[in-house]
Structure formats: structure tokens, C-alpha cells
Amino acid sequence: MGYLIFGAFFLFLLIGVPIGLSIGLAALVVFLQAGIPLQMVPQTLFEGNNSFSLVAVPFFILAGDVLARGGISERIVAFAESCLGRIRGGLSIVSVLASMFIAAISGSGAATTAAVGASLLPELEERKYDVDFSAALIASAGTIGVVIPPSVPMVLYAVIAGESVAKLFLGGFIPGTLMGLGLILWAIYIAKKRNYPAGKKYSAKEVWHKFVTALWGLMCPGIILGGIFSGIFTPSEAAAVAVLYTLLVAIFVYKALDFKHFYKLVVGSGVTSALVMFIIATSKVFGWGLAFYQIPQAIAGAMLSVTGNDAFLVYLMIDVIILIAGMFMETASALIILTPIFLPAIIGVGGNLVHFGVVLTVGLAIGMATPPVAINIYVASAITGLPMGKITKPIIPMVLILCAVFFLITYVPGLVLLLPGY
């Protein structure tokens, strides 16, 4: 039966059926073949979205869009540039640091790439940085958007695995920081090798002015994450606070949004949220079909049998599958499908589910910068006008750096579990 459900899923994908429909139709095939009453389908679809934690998903998506289009990201980037732009290759370092900071607000890789790319790519080109390298760096740094909290994929994983969203968020800090540091070191190496120029030297007064201008945006991560970890509000409530705060700043402080642009922004975010929530709902039906035939348990049994219950080999097999899945599937849909499949194997080798949730998120995030799907490369390509192939070559070493961090946190779980307190 596993061959039927996965075969149907990949067949629908190959003929161009959207991912959400492919998941739902594959599950429907199993329902029909097994003679399960079809009344179960709408009930299971409803259950898929019937979780308070999922309220965070559309709110974080909207907050990311407001951040990118409300003038907040531009001012954060300008402040970072005033601090570091004076050193050789400083603007490329700013690209990564800005991505890390904006990741702490948006919760989305594509939103992070769009926000930083729109602000910095034109200036990088003007300063004689190679456009393909700059686009690749920002696209790869955008993957940090779903690792440093808040993170939409981590919210989805928490709902499926029954884990704490706050602990997953804490677990993402160190891996996200390591990803950023790796990319910064690569950017410094390339800047010296290609003799990229130093930027403008700002006076202390100018730096202070940039800081004051960006302060409202700089306060946002502290309000969101501080509120979550201090227990003032839940992650779902934090998402609503993020939207309210970014809207107030964008409309009344920076005056970068009017009603017309706000309407378009809300509609666009609503469409994106609807697609994500539809994928979540159909994945619940898909997961029900898998559980009905005990396919996750069968896969776990096969993995444990092949590896002799060796945790190192089990994690290695899972890591490779995660990286491949991330190359061909959107992050949220891949996470929703893979989580129930791999959890029995992780439990079987005594793995920590918070650790695995962060590992899964990082692995799938790398797929955002790995063709053929590579949504972050698409975003960078749209901003620069470069074809994807031009960005793919310089992004390869950056993806390898991210993969090194991925395997490091897999086999050194303390890097993930230190802050959650395990």
C-alpha cells in the first residue's frame, strides 16, 4: 500500500498537479482502494487545521510581508551598512547579518530573501560586487529565515509531533547563527580574493542617526521573542503581536504603507496563507492514510533493520532523504509529509524530538537554495533579472557550507538542545 500512496503522489506531481492537490488526491486513492467511508475526508481535512498553534502561520506570513514592504527591512539594512560597510567586502557581510536579523521577525525564507535582496542587491551591483555572487549569497542567507525563530516550519512540526513551539524556537538559535557565521566567512574569503571595494565610511553621528531611524524595527525581535520566552504570550499570540507592531511602525512611524498598498499586501498574504493551510489540511488526510496502513512503522522497522539500530546510520539515511526532498518539494509540504514517516525511527533510536525538529527544518531550509525548486534563487533571480543558472554556480559552495552545519547539528545534538535546557 505504501507503493500505491507514494506512487500516486509522485505521479500527480509529475503531471503538474499542484502540491496540495497531489497530496490530497494520493490520499483519496488510498481511501477508495481500502473502502474507507469518504465522509472521513472532510472530517480529517477539518482536523488538519483545527489547532490553535496554526493561527501563527498566517500571522507570521503577513508580518514577513509587512517587514519587506513597510520600510522596516530597508532601515535595518541601512543601519547595518553604516556599521560594517566601511570594511572590504563589508556589504556582503551586511547581507548575511541583515538576513539573520530579519529572520528573527519574518519566519520565512522567501520573505527574508526578498526583504534583503530588494534593499541590498542594487547597491551591491553599484559597488562593483559580482551580481551572481551577491544574489547567491542573499539566497543562501535567506534559508536562515526559517531556522532563527520565529519559524513557520517549526510551528508546523510542533503541531504534528506534539512538541513545544518555544523549545523548538530556542533550539534554532545556535544552528541559525552557525549558518550565518559560515556564510560570513565565505563572503570575507571571496571579498579578499576578488578585491571587492570598501564602502563609505560613516561618521559616528551618521551611524547614530541610522540607529535611531532603525530602532523601531530593531525592537521587533526583542518584543516577539522576549514575549514568548518570558511567558507573556504564546507563539500564536506573538505572531499576532508581530503583525500589529510591524503594521503600526510601517503605517504611522515610517509612513511607508497607505491603504491601497496595505490592501494588496493583505490579499497577497491571504493567498499565500490559504495555500499553506490547504497543504496542511490535505497532508493530514495523507498522514491518516499512512497511519491506517502503518506505513511509518514499516519504514522505521526497515531502517532499523538495515542499520542494525545504529543511530548514526539511521540519522545519516534520514539526513540524505531530507536534503533530496528539500530539493524537489516546498519546505512546509515536505515537513508535513516527512515528520510522521520519520518520527517512529527517531523514537526507535532514542532520539530527541526537539533536536530532530530543528534538524529537519535546517535540512529542508537548505532546499530553498538548491535547484530545481530553490524558491530563494527564484526570488533573487526576479530581483536581479539574472537567469537561475547564473546564480546556481556560485551558490554551490554556500550550500556545502550549510550542509556542513546540517550534519554538525545532527551529530552534535547539544548545539540544538543547549538553549532549550535538555
Q: Which residues make up each language-model segment?
A:
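Alpha-helical transmembrane segments of multi-pass membrane transport proteins
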Residues: 1-422
